[in-house]
Amino acid sequence: MHVSRSRLAISALAAVAAVQAVANVVRIQEEGMDMITLSNRFGSLKVSLRGAQVRSYKPAGMAEDILFAPKTTTLEGTKDDRGGIPVCWPWFGRNGEPGTESHGFARYSRFEVRGQKEKDDGTILTLGLKPTDETRKVWPYDFDLEYTIRLGATLDLSLRTRNTDARPVKITEGLHPYWRVSDRNKVRVDGLDGCLYCFADVSQVADQTWKGAFVPNGHFDHVFTLTKHEQTITDAGWGRTVVLRGSGYSKIVIWTPEGAFENLTAEDALHFVCVEPATLFRPDAYTLAPGEEHVLSVSIAVSGK
């Protein structure tokens, strides 16, 4: 069969283009952990296949990482591996069955790489998780969990749950980002004025109304019932703002410890604020019928230094 030189040249160019299309997605090993780095003109990020945890995110031109990581963190980690953006699924907080781990099993399960794509508006990485013998020990359902990360002018995260079981399932979930800040006493969170809230250490009933901006200058574990899905974190120390916009969740959780906490030092506690899009508490759980899907999505826009 005769193939023209021009067709061969086109095929060669297509092969080169295919390589270039994924050149911004690189798999690496770091401290024995499988990691994937994404980099393009919009910035760079690093994600661990363990838990699909985004561990680092630096938009182009930013001097500091957007995400906090404690100096004591080891990537081999434990089930309470703090920092970055943990994925909390299929329950958030202590809302699983009695005796189960807080924040679900996705955060310490190994995800598979399902796809990677380069587009004009960003680099896209898709990760996935399906049931294993280990997950069935704590949650006896079939499911398909897909996590799509797009590094573009914004960082877009999409967590899609599909119920592949023959039974309905109830789910709470969320993302648990640790936002790195200059000093939490110089931070404010806007977009919560007028929201009903509760202090989760005390109650799960949102029966108080928040007024004005939130200043996380102590220990908080506050859960806000959203009236809008746009919150702004302003760091006066670094002149930086982080804006969260999204859908598919009903709450924002703000968590900060008072002083040292587990593997976090008192100094660590001053340099992060957790502002977490989530659906939590059992009465708020959503039910998926067999074959049904739900998507939690968050777009993160950063400006400043």
Where would I find each of the regions flagged by the language model?
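Hydrophobic h-region of N-terminal signal peptides that target proteins for export
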Residues: 13-21
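Beta-strand-rich N-terminal accessory domains
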Residues: 21-82, 228-251, 292-305
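Extended, loop-rich substrate-binding clefts of extracytoplasmic carbohydrate-active enzymes
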Residues: 27-30, 100-152
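Bacterial N-terminal signal peptides that target proteins for export
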Residues: 1-9
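Acidic, contiguous internal or C-terminal segments within carbohydrate-active enzymes
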Residues: 56, 131-171, 175-176
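Beta-strand/loop-rich accessory regions of lumenal/periplasmic or secreted enzymes
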Residues: 78-106, 190-199, 203, 213
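Active-site pocket scaffolds in enzymes
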Residues: 68-70, 88, 242-305
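Active-site/ligand-binding surface loops and adjacent short beta/alpha elements
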Residues: 168-170, 174-251
